[in-house]
């Protein structure tokens, strides 16, 4: 029974170390998504501002 516990604990330790190596990929994907959202926000806000200005000028 003790051997099984040792095998399980070593398995989980290896798995945790592997997941930390891919963090840069996750960070890159998140920054891409944030950049896309910022572009969408800038585009939609500029349309709103343009409509508001045309209403004020009319």
UniProtKB/Swiss-Prot annotation:
Point out the coiled-coil segments of this chain: none
Look up keyword Repeat and say if it applies.
no
InterPro entries hit by this protein: SpoIISB-like (IPR048199)
Q: Does the keyword Cell division apply?
A: no
Q: What keywords appear on the UniProt entry?
A: Sporulation, Toxin-antitoxin system
Q: Name one GO biological process term.
A: sporulation resulting in formation of a cellular spore
Q: How does it assemble?
A: Probably forms a complex with SpoIISA neutralizing its toxic activity.
What's this chain's function?
A: Antitoxin component of a type II toxin-antitoxin (TA) system. Antitoxin that binds toxin SpoIISA and neutralizes its toxic activity. Upon coexpression with SpoIISA in E.coli normal growth is restored.
* Family membership noted in the UniProt record: Belongs to the SpoIISB antitoxin family.
What is the name of this protein? Stage II sporulation protein SB
Question: What is this organism's lineage?
Answer: Bacteria, Bacillati, Bacillota, Bacilli, Bacillales
């Amino acid at each position: 029974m003790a051997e099984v516990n040792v095998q399980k604990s070593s398995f989980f330790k290896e798995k945790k170390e592997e997941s930390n190596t891919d963090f840069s990929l996750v960070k890159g994907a998140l920054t891409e998504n944030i950049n896309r959202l910022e572009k969408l926000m800038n585009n939609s806000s500029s349309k709103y501002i343009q409509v508001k200005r045309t209403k004020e000028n009319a």
